[in-house]
Amino acid sequence: MVGFDDEKKKIVHELVDINNANRSVISMVGMGGLGKTTLAKSVYNDFEVKRSFDIFAWVIISQEYTIHEVLKRIKSEVSATPLADTIQDLSVAISEKLKKGKYLIVLDDVWKEDAWTELLKVFPDVNNGSRVIITTRFLNVAKIADPTIQPHELRLLNIKESKELFLRKVFPRQNTETCCSDDLLDSAHQLVKRCGGLPLALVVLGGLVSTKPQTKDAWQKVVESMKRQFVKGGDKCLEILALSYNDLPHYLKSCFLYFGCFGEDMNIPSKTVIRLWSAEGFLPTENGKTIEESGFDCLVELAQRCLIQVTEHEYDDGVKYCQIHDLLRDMCISEAKDNRFLEIYQNDTVDRATMPNAARRLIIFNEIKTLNYSNSKLRGLFYSLGSYQRLDFAALNGQLGKFKLLRVLYVNKLVISEFPSEIK
């Protein structure tokens, strides 16, 4: 945890403080990409914390949420057993379960005050030292959650910390003090200064540089690229993310843009991504390698460049699940729209929608009743629904035959008795 060791110690102390029996809410506040979730995970998995609580739950809230879905996630995490599935029954069941032990609940990425006020009643205060952790970009959310406790406002990294984090990403398995020459250190200093101390920018830039030769000339080319791309007064983080995207080989750009097809904070199975890439013909064919092996190579390179995060490994250290940071996902979607790679509809009903640029993929993130839509160039139709949403395939009755070029139909949550005749 470069730059946040002292903050972590303070938070751990607040969590395990035996002199505070009240249920307390500890908030971490800061802009996107500052490392709130990384710090929260480090605290959550700390040995002293793990042995101090009985019940644990980690729930991502995000911008688009429903209280019903959040409660279902909490119920699943704490193994509560409601008799029914209503908000009221879920709330009662969770509260009763949490009364039985000392709990630690993490609410990650809370955007609105309403999210906390709606959830407050399910976290009982039985004077046993239970805790709730909130990560948020907004100070008002932190203050309303627990006015008695000062929020932890995370700071930007200083230049020394920035260089340390950057070099850790460039040389993940090496000692930076012995493998980094003075010439490279000089280039590193020029690079990290442009990141403004933002951890996400530093790790993405470090991931980019890790793919380059370890020479002064190669690193200086990255410095010059940054100088050409950066606009005075522009968002440095977004410019660095764009620089890293533009550095990708052509085939890997398409693979990366595909992550815009998945919901925010979704834990994505690697095999699902690889099958989709394969169906689209994105994966390079190399002698002696299967399509699946090429797909895993692409995932590994995207992870090395810190454009995606590996959330779970296979037994052989391969990628099992992955995720994309919400800022990177925002950039991914923006770039994908500009290139007519995809278009997103999040309204309840897509009714005779007309794509202005005939994008090749349509992404739907919410449940819909009907799909009355035409696009002769559509290659992919994605229903990327929330954890507890379901698609009734009746919404597609008579629709799929319109999409003559359709190569991919992706539905992650499905209620179906038989397939539509168009795809039997």
Question: Can you say where each PLM-predicted feature lies in the sequence?
Answer:
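N-terminal flanking helix/linker immediately upstream of nucleotide/cofactor-binding cores
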Residues: M1-L34, T38-F47, D54, I60-S62, ...
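An amphipathic alpha-helix signature
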Residues: K8, V12, K41, I67-K75, ...
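Conserved beta-strand scaffold positions in the cores of enzyme catalytic domains, especially
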Residues: V25, F56-W58, V132, P151-L154, ...
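Short, polar loop motifs at secondary-structure junctions
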Residues: N45-D46, W111-D114, T136-A142, N366-K369, ...
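Short amphipathic alpha-helix in the helical subdomain of ABC transporter nucleotide-binding domains
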Residues: I67, I87-L90, L184, A188, ...
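Non-catalytic, charged helical/coil tracts that couple and regulate nucleotide-powered enzyme cores
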Residues: I74-D85, V92, N128-V132, F138-K253, ...
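Loop/turn-to-beta-strand initiation segments
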Residues: K100-I105, N127-I133
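Surface-exposed helical/coil interface segments that assemble multiprotein signaling complexes
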Residues: P124-V126, E177-T178, L208-C255, F259-K424
